[in-house]
Regions:
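A glycine- and charged-residue-rich anion-binding loop/surface
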Residues: 1-227
Length: 227
C-alpha cells in the first residue's frame, strides 16, 4: 500500500483537512472498531514516545447525512497511517478531519522542550537520551548517564534561557549525502527520508513529530522529579 501523505510534516499548525478513504478494515485488536486509511492526514500517529493526536472525522456519503466520529487511536505501520474509529464507513467516501488543537499544541510544546533539554545534556555532559515518553501533562526522559542536582539545575536554567531567546526552529529533509556529513542525535538506525529538527546552537535531532515554530512558544520548562 502506498504510504500516507503526512500533512503534519509541512503544516503542523493546521487543524482541519480533507481526504479520501482508501481502505476500511475491521480492527484485529478492538472488537467493533475499524482501521481507516486515508490518502492524506493531519493526525500524528503514536510513535517516537509520543501519544497520537485526538480529534474527529466527518464522513460524507453522497446524498446521505454526514457521519461524525471520534478518532480513538492513530497508528503507523510501514508508512501507512491507520485511524481507529467505531463507526463503519466506505471506501472512496470523502472525509473532513479535525484535530484537537489544544492537545496537539501541548504535545508540540513538550516535544520541543525535550529536544532542548536533551540537546543541552548531550552537548554539555555527553549523555544520550535513550528513552522518552510524552503524556498529557508531563514528559519523562531517560539518559545513559547520571546528572547531579547542580547539573540538572544548570540544564534547566539554560533551557529556559533558550525559551526566552525565542529561537526559530529549522526543519528539513536533507539528502543522504548531506546526512553523511551532518552531526545529529538519533536513537536508532534510520531508513528512507530523514526529517531533521534543528534548534540553532542548541540541538540537531532526527524527529518525525510536529514542533513549535519558535522556542518561546514552549513557555517554561521545570524539572519535577528525578529518579
Amino acid at each position: 500500500m502506498e504510504q500516507t501523505n503526512c500533512l503534519y510534516d509541512k503544516f503542523p499548525y493546521e487543524t482541519e483537512f480533507d481526504g479520501t478513504i482508501l481502505t476500511v478494515t475491521p480492527s484485529p485488536k478492538h472488537e467493533g472498531c475499524y482501521e481507516v486509511v486515508l490518502d492524506q492526514t493531519l493526525f500524528f500517529p503514536e510513535q517516537g514516545g509520543q501519544t497520537p493526536d485526538q480529534g474527529q472525522l466527518v464522513v460524507s456519503h453522497g446524498m446521505r447525512p454526514q457521519t461524525e466520529m471520534n478518532v480513538l487511536d492513530v497508528q503507523i505501520r510501514d508508512g501507512v497511517i491507520y485511524h481507529l474509529v467505531d463507526t463503519p464507513v466506505e471506501v472512496a467516501d470523502h472525509v473532513h478531519g479535525k484535530i484537537d488543537w489544544d492537545y496537539r499544541f501541548s504535545n508540540m510544546q513538550q516535544h520541543t522542550g525535550e529536544h532542548m533539554f536533551s540537546g543541552i545534556v548531550h552537548s554539555t555532559f555527553g549523555y544520550n537520551n535513550v528513552g522518552f515518553h510524552l503524556s498529557d501533562s508531563i514528559v519523562t526522559m531517560d539518559f545513559d548517564g547520571v546528572l547531579t542536582a547542580e547539573e540538572l539545575m544548570e540544564v534547566e536554567t539554560r533551557v529556559n534561557q533558550v525559551i526566552a531567546d525565542d529561537l526559530l526552529l529549522e526543519i528539513a529533509f536533507p539528502t543522504p549525502q548531506m546526512l553523511e556529513t551532518m552531526e545529529y542525535r538519533s536513537k536508532k538506525e534510520l531508513e528512507g527520508p530523514v526529517r531533521i529538527v534543528a534548534i540553532p546552537g542548541v540541538d540537531v535531532c532526527a524527529c518525525c513529530a510536529p514542533h513549535v515554530k519558535r522556542t518561546g512558544e514552549v513557555g517554561i520548562l521545570k524539572i519535577m522529579q528525578v529518579q
